[in-house]
Design a protein with these regions (language model features):
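C-terminal motif of bacterial Sec signal peptides marking the signal peptidase cleavage site
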Residues: 22-25
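Short hotspots in intrinsically disordered terminal tails
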Residues: 2-3, 240
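Buried hydrophobic residues that stabilize the cores of well-folded domains
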Residues: 28-243
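Bacterial N-terminal signal peptides that target proteins for export
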Residues: 3-13
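Sec-dependent N-terminal signal peptides
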Residues: 12-20
Length: 243
């Protein structure tokens, strides 16, 4: 699978082209009572490689910390919030990446100033309502890289940049915690810049085609998402805590 525009410290191999995130909580019906559920463990398996993310939340239900190990190194990601500003610090004990993120009134990411050593990456998102229309990325004040997006019936269905075009398809189920866009953005940003009406079912980037399938429990929560491209299969599974 390919996670677009992911952070350099993000080990998901679904990485490549755009950057994204959704709300971490979901609702579960149990008799006449409703429970609020949050993803606390994400296990990403590709071939013989496995990465596990352990996630905690603050009292407001926002992601607070995230720990994972990849490439023989342990990473700690800390999220802090002040008004419309979100700060994200990702460290392996030697190097630290800092993101300063500004959110709009819909809670969507407008700007992300990412500092990696002496490198500054600035991402600016433009919306029509809650639909991402354009994303501009600039590194160290250099030449801007622009991606534009198209939407159909509340779903992101296409993107175009100087490197090519991509198309996206969806199933008929409403988007929820644990679906493709949701988990990409939760793990990387704790906030969103793409919110779709339905769950991503597949996409094509150039000649690469990926099919995305979901596993649900008996309450309807997503417990795993599987990406298949040719002979490559990646499975991301979840554990929840419910109150």
């Amino acid at each position: 699978m390919y996670f677009y525009g992911m952070k350099n410290t993000h080990p998901f191999l679904l990485a490549a082209f755009l950057c994204l995130f959704l709300a971490p909580s979901c609702s579960k019906k149990s008799g006449s009572s409703a429970q609020t559920c949050q993803i606390i463990t994400v296990t990403d398996q590709l071939g013989t490689g496995t990465t596990t993310y352990n996630i905690t939340y603050n009292n407001s239900g926002q992601i607070s910390t995230e720990q994972y190990a990849t490439g023989g190194q342990n990473y700690n990601r800390v999220f802090t919030y002040l008004g419309s500003t979100e700060m994200i610090s990702t460290s392996n004990g030697t190097n630290t990446v800092i993101d300063s993120v500004t959110l709009n009134s819909d809670g969507l990411i407008v700007t992300d100033y990412e500092t990696i050593g002496t490198t500054l990456n600035v991402t600016t998102n433009t919306y029509s309502g809650t639909e991402l229309q354009k994303q501009v990325q600039v590194q160290n004040g250099g030449t801007p890289s622009t991606t534009t997006y198209t939407w159909t019936n509340g779903d992101l269905t296409g993107s175009s940049s100087s490197t090519g075009t991509s198309t996206y398809t969806y199933n008929t189920k409403a988007s929820e915690a644990g679906d493709y866009w949701s988990i990409v953005q939760l793990v990387n940003y704790g906030s969103s810049f793409v919110k779709t009406a339905h769950q991503l079912a597949g996409y094509q980037i150039g000649t690469t085609v990926e099919n995305v399938n979901y596993t649900y429990d008996n309450t309807g929560k997503i417990t795993a998402v599987t990406g298949t491209s040719g002979t490559s299969v990646e499975t991301i599974s979840y554990q929840y805590t419910c109150n």
